[in-house]
């Protein structure tokens, strides 16, 4: 995704902490005018958001987009549910994974691609507490090894 024309607005780092992200897909999102202006200003929070499939459509819940300052009476509800745009085949594939395998749809990133807001949707499996502790231990061990090699190269 290091292509020109893509500007990452917000990352959901908590998703990588709480879930194993097994697959990622790109989805468009239906927004109002003041919502896209707030997103371009970077006033969006993905932290507690999730997606759900209802009647063959994918909906995004709890995505907080702050009201636009100059929006006056045309401003939007910050937490309204928003429809995601996916191909029919992608939705059918997601239905099977979510219902039978017990996976969850979590937005991992929101970005602008050629002027359009896109959401990177992760198909995720929840982590248990011992998985989180194991990840933290691995990260600390890796950091310690890198520190050791860095100091060894300096001659300490």
UniProtKB/Swiss-Prot annotation:
<dbReference type="Pfam" id="PF01668">
    <property type="entry name" value="SmpB"/>
</dbReference>
<comment type="function">
    <text>Required for rescue of stalled ribosomes mediated by trans-translation. Binds to transfer-messenger RNA (tmRNA), required for stable association of tmRNA with ribosomes. tmRNA and SmpB together mimic tRNA shape, replacing the anticodon stem-loop with SmpB. tmRNA is encoded by the ssrA gene; the 2 termini fold to resemble tRNA(Ala) and it encodes a 'tag peptide', a short internal open reading frame. During trans-translation Ala-aminoacylated tmRNA acts like a tRNA, entering the A-site of stalled ribosomes, displacing the stalled mRNA.</text>
</comment>
<dbReference type="GO" id="GO:0005829">
    <property type="term" value="C:cytosol"/>
</dbReference>
<dbReference type="InterPro" id="IPR020081">
    <property type="entry name" value="SsrA-bd_prot_CS"/>
</dbReference>
<dbReference type="GO" id="GO:0070929">
    <property type="term" value="P:trans-translation"/>
</dbReference>
<dbReference type="GO" id="GO:0003723">
    <property type="term" value="F:RNA binding"/>
</dbReference>
<dbReference type="InterPro" id="IPR023620">
    <property type="entry name" value="SmpB"/>
</dbReference>
<comment type="similarity">
    <text>Belongs to the SmpB family.</text>
</comment>
<keyword id="KW-0694">RNA-binding</keyword>
<dbReference type="InterPro" id="IPR000037">
    <property type="entry name" value="SsrA-bd_prot"/>
</dbReference>
<keyword id="KW-0963">Cytoplasm</keyword>
<protein>
    <recommendedName>
        <fullName>SsrA-binding protein</fullName>
    </recommendedName>
</protein>
